[in-house]
Amino acid sequence: MNTDEHRYKRGVLSVFICVHLWLIFLSGCSRYAEFTLPPASGGDPDLTFAFDALPEPVLSRGQGWDSGDVLNPSVIRHDDQLLNYYSGFDGHTWHTGRATSSDGIHWQRQGKLLSPDPSTWEGSYIAANGAVLEWQGRVWYWYVGGPKTHPQIGLNGRVVLPTGPYLSWDEIGVSDPYVIRIAPYFYLYYTGLDRGRRQRLGVARSADGVHWEKLRTNPILAPGDPGSFDENGLGEPAVWQSHGFYWMLDTGRDIAENRRLGLARSLDGVHWTKLPAIFQGTQSWDSKAICDPTVLVDGDTIRVWFGGGDVASPDENLHGQIGYGTLRPVNATLQK
């Protein structure tokens, strides 16, 4: 081998090593893939929803661990009852509790289930804001843990969805998991936070609920223009399938930190279109915030539990309580 060939091959090898290491650095601890959800059948393009909520909360603040806020409901049907895994704030720390109900309106508290472990990745601030799902006879609960400045998503005491790599859209935090299952995958919708403190939405998928690959083209939904209901950020997605589409409720924050729910629609679960419908609190107890939706399609009824508060705040101390309503399909053209 002559000197020029040797230099050339060493140069190619050096470039390969540098590029390989850079790709590893960019990938962080997460895997990435291109995917969509199974295509929806499509439905009436003029279909939208109206929201009919009960005037009073269905789960109010308690004593001790959930005396500050009661928010972030996640509801499933289990046997002959409903289970609600919700977040309680005691003024310093977020915990997860559980309540049960036969009708989704009258709830019985079962106590606190989960608190952060300061000796682990969870830190001392949060072990809540989760997503519950029943699969193969077991109840799975993905939750947010970690310090307030760097949240991650965990399952059974370990991080399963970490933050993204340097300068990525979810570098600073991932939170607000919402998990659905469409065989053979789980799909996890979540909020990502970048170093500019912008909140956007993304999706990941997993074959086992533990090992996730993020969508390479995340984020899938971003805040709106100045003056919009979600100009200051959006998060807390809730996704379901009905009427020929995938639908999403998400929480938008305006410049004054009032929170309202927005509605979006998709044919593949990845490419979303925001719809004009915006749902806001109509009572004194949820006058400043309506947030944290969870959706249960129960026969022909689309049931929604949500958090509400009378204080405008981006995170806690809302005087938070949990409300209930239903989504009623309507024709957008006839509403005009």
Provide a role label for each language-model segment.
Residues M1-A33, T333-K336:
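Intrinsic disorder/low-complexity segments
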